Amino acid sequence: MNKANSFSKEELVTCGHGNLFGANSPRLPIDNMLMIDRITKINDDGGEFGKGEIVAELDIDPSLWFFGCHFETDPVMPGCLGLDAMWQLVGFFLGWEGAEGKGRALGVGEVKFTGQVLPDAKKVTYKLTIKRKVYRKLVMGIADAVMEVDGREIYSATDLKVGIFTDTSSF
């Protein structure tokens, strides 16, 4: 298993194809839905709760697909994409720790949007701290997160929940 503490875009895409941690590990989305360009820090003992943390980045470019359709004369990154990136990172963390199965977002406690990502921004940074890890019949990660644009916090989310399932047919 790859226990590196940072990952490039190429490695994240490899994860999306099931080839980073193994064919049965949780996958990241690929292509336009992958909202992460790199993970600059990941560990299993850091963060506010001492259970792990992740720092990741997305480079902003005016040509990103969502600026062309959200909205035509008022381009802004949809808030749901930032939230989804946070869930993506919780699932990635569980795969990095060795979980096997398919990742599914299970919920979030509270989300706050206090800013926006516009086409002239340069970089989004996601900072997650793992609050709880469950490795029983149900594998689940719970995290708190913030999203910054060019160093300014604009989103926060508490109790992001992601489960890892070996069978999703009854979902």
Curated annotation (Swiss-Prot):
It comes from the Bacteria. The keyword Endoplasmic reticulum does not apply. Pfam families: FabA. It is found in: Cytoplasm. Keywords: Cytoplasm, Fatty acid biosynthesis, Fatty acid metabolism, Isomerase, Lipid biosynthesis, Lipid metabolism, Lyase. The active site is at residue 70. Pathway: Lipid metabolism; fatty acid biosynthesis. It catalyses: a (3R)-hydroxyacyl-[ACP] = a (2E)-enoyl-[ACP] + H2O; (3R)-hydroxydecanoyl-[ACP] = (2E)-decenoyl-[ACP] + H2O; (2E)-decenoyl-[ACP] = (3Z)-decenoyl-[ACP]. GO terms for cellular component: cytoplasm. GO terms for molecular function: (3R)-hydroxyacyl-[acyl-carrier-protein] dehydratase activity; trans-2-decenoyl-acyl-carrier-protein isomerase activity. Gene3D superfamilies: Hotdog Thioesterase. One of its GO terms (biological process) is unsaturated fatty acid biosynthetic process. Its EC number is 4.2.1.59, 5.3.3.14. InterPro entries: FabA (IPR010083), FabA_FabZ (IPR013114), HotDog_dom_sf (IPR029069). NCBIfam families: fabA (TIGR01749), PRK05174.1 (NF003509). Belongs to the thioester dehydratase family. FabA subfamily. Homodimer. Necessary for the introduction of cis unsaturation into fatty acids. Catalyzes the dehydration of (3R)-3-hydroxydecanoyl-ACP to E-(2)-decenoyl-ACP and then its isomerization to Z-(3)-decenoyl-ACP. Can catalyze the dehydratase reaction for beta-hydroxyacyl-ACPs with saturated chain lengths up to 16:0, being most active on intermediate chain length. This is 3-hydroxydecanoyl-[acyl-carrier-protein] dehydratase. It comes from Shewanella loihica (strain ATCC BAA-1088 / PV-4). The lineage of its organism: Bacteria, Pseudomonadati, Pseudomonadota, Gammaproteobacteria, Alteromonadales. The gene is fabA.
